[in-house]
C-alpha cells in the first residue's frame, strides 16, 4: 500500500530529524511533517499494530489524525525496525499453536522483543506465558522482513524471528492473550492470524523440522 509507505517514510525522516536537530525552526518543521503524515494516515486508515500485539485497523483506533499523531510521535530516537519473536515447538510431528484473544485466529506463540532479553529468552518466555509449556530454545530457524511476506500492511516496519524450541514440560494454559492452545499437523492447519504468521511461513517451519540441517532463512 503506497500511502502507508509514504506515512512510514515520513515518520522515519521526522523521527531522525527530531533526534539530531538542534535548530528550533527545523524542529517545528519536522513536527509539521508529523502532522501531515497523520493526516495522510487518517485518509485511508490502514492495518496497524497498535491496539494489540500485531493487528488493529485504523478504524478500531478511531482513525483520527490525533490518534495517528500520537502513534507517530510515540517513538523516539533513530528509527529502526521492530522485532517480533515466534517460538516453534514440535510434538509428535505437530506444531504448537495458540488461539489469539484479539481476533480468535491461530498463531505460533510469540510477541514483540523486549529490551534486556535475548531472542532465545523471549521465545521461551512467550511460549510459557501464552501456552503454559516450558521450552528451551535450540536454533534460529528464520529471520524474515515482514514487508516481504504476505502479511496485511501495517504501520510498523518489522523483522520476524522464528526460534526452534524443545519441549521440556508444562501443560496447556490460557492467558489474557490466549483463548486456547493445541498442536496441529501440516495438513490440518487452523485458520491463521495473518498479521502474526502466514501459511507459507508455517509450512516452511515444518520443512525445517523435517530437515534439521537446513540453514537459517533470512529476508
Name the predicted role of every residue range.
Residues 1-25, 38:
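Long amphipathic alpha-helical segments
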Residues 6, 29, 197-201:
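Short, hydrophobic-biased amphipathic alpha-helical segments
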Residues 24-28, 154:
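Short, solvent-exposed positions on alpha-helices
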Residues 31-53, 58-86:
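Acidic, metal-coordinating catalytic segment for phosphate/diphosphate chemistry
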Residues 50, 69-107, 135, 139:
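N-terminal strand-loop-strand
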Residues 109-111:
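Extended, positively charged loop/linker patches that create polyanion-binding surfaces
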Amino acid at each position: 500500500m503506497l500511502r502507508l509507505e509514504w506515512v512510514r517514510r515520513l515518520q522515519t525522516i521526522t523521527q531522525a530529524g527530531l533526534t539530531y536537530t538542534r535548530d528550533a525552526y527545523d524542529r517545528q518543521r519536522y513536527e509539521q511533517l508529523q502532522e501531515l503524515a497523520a493526516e495522510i494516515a487518517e485518509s485511508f486508515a490502514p492495518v496497524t499494530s497498535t491496539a494489540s500485539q500485531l493487528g488493529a485497523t485504523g478504524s478500531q483506533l478511531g482513525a483520527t489524525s490525533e490518534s495517528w499523531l500520537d502513534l507517530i510521535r510515540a517513538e523516539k530516537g533513530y528509527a529502526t525496525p521492530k522485532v517480533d519473536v515466534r517460538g516453534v515447538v514440535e510434538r509428535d510431528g505437530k506444531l504448537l499453536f495458540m488461539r489469539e484473544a484479539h481476533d480468535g485466529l491461530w498463531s505460533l506463540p510469540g510477541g514483540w522483543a523486549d529490551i534486556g532479553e535475548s531472542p532465545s529468552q523471549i521465545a521461551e518466555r512467550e511460549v510459557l506465558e501464552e501456552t503454559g509449556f516450558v521450552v528451551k530454545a535450540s536454533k534460529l530457524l528464520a529471520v524474515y522482513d515482514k514487508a516481504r511476506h504476505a502479511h496485511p500492511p501495517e504501520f510498523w516496519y518489522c523483522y520476524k524471528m522464528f526460534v526452534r524450541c524443545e519441549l521440556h514440560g508444562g501443560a496447556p494454559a490460557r492467558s489474557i492473550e490466549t483463548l486456547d492452545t493445541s498442536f496441529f499437523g501440516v495438513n490440518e492447519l487452523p485458520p491463521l492470524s495473518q498479521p502474526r504468521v502466514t501459511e507459507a511461513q508455517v509450512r516452511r517451519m515444518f520443512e525445517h523440522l523435517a530437515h534439521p540441517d537446513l540453514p537459517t532463512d533470512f529476508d
